Amino acid sequence: LSSLNYNGAFLYNGTWVKALETIRNNNADLRWEKKHEFNVGLDWDVLGGRLGGTVDYYIRRTKDALWDYEVPVPPYMYPTMLANASEMENKGLEILIRATPIQTEKFTWNTNVSYSTNSNKVVALSSEKFSMDQDYFYTGYTGEPIQTTTHIVQVGKPIGTFYGLKSVDITDDGLWLVENKKGEHVLAEETDATDWQVLGNGIPKHYLNWNNTFNFFNFDLSINMRGAFGFQILNYQRMYY
Protein backbone atom coordinates (compact mmCIF):
# COMPACT_ATOMS: atom_id res chain seq x y z
CA LEU A 1 0.00 0.00 0.00
CA SER A 2 1.66 3.19 -1.23
CA SER A 3 0.74 6.78 -0.41
CA LEU A 4 1.52 9.50 -2.92
CA ASN A 5 1.45 13.26 -2.72
CA TYR A 6 2.08 16.13 -5.11
CA ASN A 7 5.44 17.86 -4.70
CA GLY A 8 6.62 20.46 -7.18
CA ALA A 9 6.31 20.27 -10.95
CA PHE A 10 8.43 19.56 -14.03
CA LEU A 11 8.34 20.71 -17.64
CA TYR A 12 7.22 18.03 -20.12
CA ASN A 13 6.62 18.76 -23.83
CA GLY A 14 6.18 22.44 -23.07
CA THR A 15 3.69 21.87 -20.22
CA TRP A 16 4.23 22.01 -16.48
CA VAL A 17 3.20 18.69 -14.91
CA LYS A 18 2.71 18.13 -11.17
CA ALA A 19 5.19 15.65 -9.73
CA LEU A 20 4.19 12.78 -7.43
CA GLU A 21 6.32 11.42 -4.62
CA THR A 22 5.98 8.51 -2.20
CA ILE A 23 5.29 9.79 1.32
CA ARG A 24 5.63 6.49 3.22
CA ASN A 25 7.18 3.07 2.76
CA ASN A 26 5.26 0.44 0.85
CA ASN A 27 4.40 -2.72 2.80
CA ALA A 28 3.10 -5.44 0.49
CA ASP A 29 2.31 -7.69 3.48
CA LEU A 30 0.00 -5.19 5.20
CA ARG A 31 -3.28 -6.90 6.15
CA TRP A 32 -6.31 -6.68 8.42
CA GLU A 33 -5.95 -7.30 12.14
CA LYS A 34 -7.24 -10.69 13.29
CA LYS A 35 -9.46 -11.41 16.28
CA HIS A 36 -9.88 -14.81 17.94
CA GLU A 37 -12.54 -15.09 20.65
CA PHE A 38 -13.74 -17.78 23.05
CA ASN A 39 -17.14 -17.10 24.56
CA VAL A 40 -19.41 -18.98 26.95
CA GLY A 41 -22.75 -17.69 28.17
CA LEU A 42 -25.95 -18.51 30.04
CA ASP A 43 -29.45 -17.12 29.47
CA TRP A 44 -32.26 -17.66 31.98
CA ASP A 45 -35.90 -16.68 32.52
CA VAL A 46 -38.35 -17.39 35.36
CA LEU A 47 -41.79 -16.21 36.48
CA GLY A 48 -43.14 -16.17 32.98
CA GLY A 49 -40.37 -13.93 31.71
CA ARG A 50 -40.76 -11.26 34.39
CA LEU A 51 -37.33 -12.09 35.79
CA GLY A 52 -34.34 -13.13 33.72
CA GLY A 53 -30.80 -12.39 32.74
CA THR A 54 -27.61 -13.36 30.97
CA VAL A 55 -24.06 -14.18 32.02
CA ASP A 56 -21.29 -14.01 29.45
CA TYR A 57 -17.54 -14.71 29.79
CA TYR A 58 -15.07 -14.12 26.98
CA ILE A 59 -11.40 -14.32 26.11
CA ARG A 60 -10.49 -12.20 23.09
CA ARG A 61 -7.07 -12.11 21.44
CA THR A 62 -6.20 -9.57 18.77
CA LYS A 63 -3.31 -10.52 16.50
CA ASP A 64 -1.46 -8.67 13.74
CA ALA A 65 -2.23 -5.28 15.33
CA LEU A 66 -0.81 -2.29 13.45
CA TRP A 67 2.06 -0.07 14.53
CA ASP A 68 4.81 2.04 12.94
CA TYR A 69 8.13 0.20 13.24
CA GLU A 70 11.61 1.56 12.66
CA VAL A 71 13.33 0.30 9.50
CA PRO A 72 16.80 1.02 8.04
CA VAL A 73 17.38 3.77 5.48
CA PRO A 74 18.43 2.57 2.95
CA PRO A 75 17.07 0.24 1.61
CA TYR A 76 13.83 1.89 2.70
CA MET A 77 13.05 5.47 1.78
CA TYR A 78 11.64 6.43 5.19
CA PRO A 79 12.69 5.38 8.73
CA THR A 80 9.34 3.86 9.75
CA MET A 81 6.88 1.38 8.26
CA LEU A 82 3.30 0.48 9.17
CA ALA A 83 3.21 -3.27 9.86
CA ASN A 84 1.23 -6.07 11.53
CA ALA A 85 3.28 -7.31 14.48
CA SER A 86 1.53 -6.64 17.81
CA GLU A 87 -0.78 -8.81 19.88
CA MET A 88 -3.19 -8.04 22.75
CA GLU A 89 -5.48 -10.11 24.98
CA ASN A 90 -8.75 -9.15 26.68
CA LYS A 91 -10.68 -11.15 29.29
CA GLY A 92 -14.04 -10.09 30.62
CA LEU A 93 -17.34 -10.89 32.28
CA GLU A 94 -20.74 -9.37 31.49
CA ILE A 95 -23.84 -9.87 33.65
CA LEU A 96 -27.37 -8.62 32.95
CA ILE A 97 -30.42 -8.99 35.21
CA ARG A 98 -33.79 -7.77 33.93
CA ALA A 99 -37.12 -7.70 35.73
CA THR A 100 -40.67 -6.39 35.59
CA PRO A 101 -41.50 -5.62 39.24
CA ILE A 102 -44.91 -4.07 38.45
CA GLN A 103 -47.22 -4.91 35.57
CA THR A 104 -50.87 -3.80 35.54
CA GLU A 105 -53.30 -2.62 32.89
CA LYS A 106 -52.39 1.02 33.54
CA PHE A 107 -48.81 0.93 34.80
CA THR A 108 -45.67 -1.09 34.01
CA TRP A 109 -42.19 -0.82 35.46
CA ASN A 110 -39.31 -2.55 33.65
CA THR A 111 -35.82 -2.47 35.10
CA ASN A 112 -32.46 -4.01 34.30
CA VAL A 113 -29.05 -3.93 35.94
CA SER A 114 -25.87 -4.72 34.02
CA TYR A 115 -22.31 -5.19 35.20
CA SER A 116 -19.16 -5.71 33.16
CA THR A 117 -15.47 -6.03 33.87
CA ASN A 118 -12.54 -6.38 31.52
CA SER A 119 -8.80 -6.86 31.89
CA ASN A 120 -6.32 -6.58 29.07
CA LYS A 121 -2.61 -6.95 28.52
CA VAL A 122 -0.14 -6.52 25.70
CA VAL A 123 1.07 -9.98 24.64
CA ALA A 124 3.63 -8.96 22.00
CA LEU A 125 4.99 -5.84 20.31
CA SER A 126 7.28 -7.56 17.82
CA SER A 127 7.29 -10.30 15.19
CA GLU A 128 10.01 -12.19 13.32
CA LYS A 129 10.21 -9.46 10.68
CA PHE A 130 9.45 -6.30 12.68
CA SER A 131 10.75 -5.69 16.19
CA MET A 132 11.58 -3.03 18.76
CA ASP A 133 14.81 -2.56 20.71
CA GLN A 134 12.85 -3.10 23.95
CA ASP A 135 9.51 -4.60 25.01
CA TYR A 136 7.87 -1.20 25.58
CA PHE A 137 7.40 2.28 24.17
CA TYR A 138 6.18 5.60 25.55
CA THR A 139 3.12 7.33 24.14
CA GLY A 140 0.67 10.10 24.96
CA TYR A 141 1.82 13.71 25.05
CA THR A 142 1.10 16.68 27.30
CA GLY A 143 2.14 19.37 24.83
CA GLU A 144 3.28 22.84 25.85
CA PRO A 145 4.80 23.78 28.21
CA ILE A 146 5.88 20.42 29.71
CA GLN A 147 6.46 18.35 26.56
CA THR A 148 6.54 14.86 28.04
CA THR A 149 4.87 11.50 27.47
CA THR A 150 2.14 10.27 29.81
CA HIS A 151 1.71 6.53 29.10
CA ILE A 152 3.72 3.36 28.65
CA VAL A 153 2.74 0.42 26.43
CA GLN A 154 4.67 -2.64 27.59
CA VAL A 155 4.47 -6.39 27.09
CA GLY A 156 2.65 -7.94 30.04
CA LYS A 157 1.04 -4.65 31.12
CA PRO A 158 -2.46 -3.31 30.34
CA ILE A 159 -3.25 -0.61 27.81
CA GLY A 160 -3.89 2.82 29.37
CA THR A 161 -1.07 2.72 31.94
CA PHE A 162 0.04 6.14 33.24
CA TYR A 163 3.83 6.34 33.59
CA GLY A 164 5.98 9.12 35.01
CA LEU A 165 7.46 10.64 38.15
CA LYS A 166 5.49 10.14 41.37
CA SER A 167 5.11 13.46 43.20
CA VAL A 168 4.99 13.15 47.00
CA ASP A 169 5.45 16.66 48.42
CA ILE A 170 6.65 20.24 47.92
CA THR A 171 9.58 21.82 49.77
CA ASP A 172 9.32 25.10 51.68
CA ASP A 173 11.00 26.70 48.66
CA GLY A 174 8.23 25.48 46.34
CA LEU A 175 10.26 22.70 44.68
CA TRP A 176 8.73 19.33 43.81
CA LEU A 177 9.72 16.25 45.80
CA VAL A 178 9.30 12.93 43.99
CA GLU A 179 9.85 9.28 44.83
CA ASN A 180 12.91 7.74 43.16
CA LYS A 181 13.48 4.06 42.32
CA LYS A 182 14.79 3.40 45.86
CA GLY A 183 11.64 4.82 47.45
CA GLU A 184 13.48 7.94 48.66
CA HIS A 185 12.00 11.44 48.45
CA VAL A 186 14.29 13.61 46.33
CA LEU A 187 14.07 16.79 44.29
CA ALA A 188 12.54 16.29 40.84
CA GLU A 189 15.64 17.80 39.20
CA GLU A 190 17.76 15.02 40.75
CA THR A 191 15.88 12.21 39.00
CA ASP A 192 16.26 10.51 35.64
CA ALA A 193 14.20 8.17 33.46
CA THR A 194 14.95 5.18 35.72
CA ASP A 195 12.92 6.84 38.48
CA TRP A 196 9.72 6.84 36.44
CA GLN A 197 7.07 4.40 37.60
CA VAL A 198 3.51 3.23 36.96
CA LEU A 199 1.10 5.84 38.34
CA GLY A 200 -2.23 4.20 37.55
CA ASN A 201 -4.50 3.35 34.64
CA GLY A 202 -7.11 5.45 32.89
CA ILE A 203 -9.32 2.56 31.70
CA PRO A 204 -12.10 1.56 34.15
CA LYS A 205 -12.00 -2.00 35.49
CA HIS A 206 -15.72 -2.11 36.26
CA TYR A 207 -18.90 -0.70 34.71
CA LEU A 208 -22.33 -0.68 36.34
CA ASN A 209 -25.57 0.38 34.67
CA TRP A 210 -29.15 0.63 35.99
CA ASN A 211 -31.97 1.35 33.54
CA ASN A 212 -35.63 1.89 34.44
CA THR A 213 -38.62 2.37 32.15
CA PHE A 214 -42.04 3.41 33.46
CA ASN A 215 -45.17 3.18 31.28
CA PHE A 216 -48.38 4.90 32.39
CA PHE A 217 -51.16 4.87 29.80
CA ASN A 218 -49.55 6.60 26.77
CA PHE A 219 -46.69 8.17 28.72
CA ASP A 220 -43.17 6.76 29.00
CA LEU A 221 -40.39 7.74 31.38
CA SER A 222 -36.86 6.34 31.21
CA ILE A 223 -34.17 6.81 33.85
CA ASN A 224 -30.66 5.51 33.27
CA MET A 225 -27.70 5.60 35.67
CA ARG A 226 -24.21 4.54 34.71
CA GLY A 227 -20.97 4.30 36.68
CA ALA A 228 -17.34 3.47 35.99
CA PHE A 229 -15.01 2.30 38.75
CA GLY A 230 -11.42 1.27 39.35
CA PHE A 231 -9.50 3.83 37.30
CA GLN A 232 -7.43 6.99 37.66
CA ILE A 233 -7.70 10.37 35.94
CA LEU A 234 -4.66 12.30 34.74
CA ASN A 235 -4.82 15.90 35.98
CA TYR A 236 -3.46 17.36 32.77
CA GLN A 237 -3.67 21.01 33.80
CA ARG A 238 -2.04 20.52 37.21
CA MET A 239 1.01 18.97 35.52
CA TYR A 240 1.88 22.48 34.34
CA TYR A 241 2.51 23.76 37.87
Sequence positions of predicted segments:
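A short local loop/turn or secondary-structure capping micro-motif enriched for an aromatic residue
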Residues: T62-K63, V186-L187, G230-Q232
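Beta-strand elements of well-folded, non-transmembrane domains
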Residues: A99-Q103, F216-N218, G227-F229
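Extracytoplasmic gating/loop element in the C-terminal half of outer-membrane beta-barrel translocons
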Residues: A228-Y241
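Active-site proximal loops enriched in glycine and acidic residues that flank catalytic Cys/His/Asp
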Residues: D56-I59, I223-F229
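Extracellular/periplasmic, surface-exposed regions of secreted and cell-surface proteins
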Residues: L1-I146, T150
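Outer-membrane beta-barrel transmembrane strand signature
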Residues: L11-V46, G52, T139-N224
